[in-house]
Design a protein with these regions (language model features):
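Hydrophobic transmembrane alpha-helices and immediately adjacent juxtamembrane helices
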Residues: 1-279
């Protein structure tokens, strides 16, 4: 059977595709040590960031590049919650093209009634929702512990939600594109390492982009990585005023479209090129 020819979806089974949303949460619940490990990593990073920013502001004064200590800590806590939980989650998942190609089960992605691209999209939606639960839980704890400040206004909170949703789409598309390179490489380890480094540095997940030189910030700020963390967190902290948010949201939406088109092209070529390491 050609990988491009898929069986028709039975009418009574089509609505069941939405059940893939629960695939990731149920898998994580089945392996509870992963939840503990993710929580430990996030708590440790937040603790170290709080110590770091308090020490820096004790030496430098009230503000650094226009950010006060409360904004800096809030930025780092939210960036950690948005980035670390998602990365740890993706790293623990075995539903990747690389792992499936190694054991040969990737062929089932292309012979199921549900298209492989839609299967990954539903699963990615579940990953985003699960990561959002970590974000909301950590945000609640951070506010109660006075580590995270509330957004400056309700409009700022609303535009942050929109920006966060767009950022999650970009996050998924970047991860998908990196994973799809497995169809053209013997191993995607190097690509994954490079993408993880770029995501951590260029998204503002490690250090706020506002602290970098102007030339670096102006370049990184227009890359898709910044759309995942820097933009929504900057809107939340008030670093980007609500009145100036339209161009940032438009750029996020543009990256969503461009990455989706590129992903669609890669899916089409991947269906015609399949290398199974197991023979």
């Amino acid at each position: 059977m050609s990988l491009l020819a898929r069986p028709a979806v039975p009418p009574d089974r089509a609505p069941r595709a939405h059940r893939l949303i629960t695939l990731v949460p149920r898998s994580e619940w089945a392996y509870r040590p992963r939840i503990v490990a993710t929580g430990f990593v996030i708590v440790t990073q937040v603790f170290l960031y709080v110590l770091l920013w308090r020490a820096l502001y004790r030496e430098s004064g009230d503000t650094v590049v226009g950010l006060d200590m409360s904004q800096a800590i809030t930025y780092s806590v939210l960036a950690t919650l948005m980035g670390t939980g998602r990365v740890v989650l993706e790293g623990a998942s075995q539903e990747t093209a690389q792992s499936k190609i190694r054991d040969g089960s990737v062929v089932f992605w292309f012979v199921r009634p549900l298209a492989a691209r839609r299967y990954c999209a539903w699963r990615g939606l579940g990953e985003s929702l699960y990561a959002t639960l970590w974000l909301l839980g950590g945000l609640t704890v951070g506010v109660l512990c006075s580590l995270v400040a509330l957004p400056p206004s309700w409009p700022a909170a609303a535009v942050t939600v929109v920006s966060y949703a767009l950022g999650q789409v970009v996050f998924h598309q970047i991860g998908l594109l990196v994973d799809l390179t497995s169809f053209w490489t013997i191993t995607s380890f190097g690509v994954n390492r490079l993408a993880a480094f770029a995501q951590l540095l260029l998204s503002g997940g490690l250090i706020p982009l506002w602290l970098f030189p102007d030339w670096f910030r102006s370049t990184a700020g227009h890359l898709p990585f910044a759309a995942t963390i820097n933009v929504p967190v900057s809107l939340y902290t008030g670093r980007i005023p609500v009145a100036d948010s339209a161009p940032y949201l438009a750029e996020q939406a543009l990256w969503c479209v461009l990455l989706a088109v590129l992903g669609r092209l890669m899916w089409r070529r991947a269906a015609r090129r399949l290398l199974v390491l197991g023979g």
